[in-house]
Curated annotation (Swiss-Prot):
Pfam assignment, any one: UPF0223
Lineage: Bacteria, Bacillati, Bacillota, Bacilli, Bacillales
Top-rank lineage group of the source organism: Bacteria
Species this chain originates from: Halalkalibacterium halodurans (strain ATCC BAA-125 / DSM 18197 / FERM 7344 / JCM 9153 / C-125) (Bacillus halodurans)
Record's protein name: UPF0223 protein BH2638
HAMAP family: UPF0223
Amino acid sequence: MKTTLPISLDWSTEEVIDVVHFFQAIEQAYDQGIAREDLLGKYRRFKEIVPSKSEEKQLFRAYEQENDVSCYQTIKKAREEMEEHIQM
């Protein structure tokens, strides 16, 4: 399955890789689940790259339209629940 990922040409190669890993973690939460701390760690790195809330929303929206997932709901669940494993 071909997935389109929202990336910026302003990001370094390392930043692109880290953003891809974040979006893969979102997918993993929907597929087989992911360790809560792993997901939140990838989100923290994502926020270092994309500190702007409006840019985050744009990237989430672009990704969600292509992949039928909710980045916001996934992160919200990881923050609110104390379970070690997040499954959407």
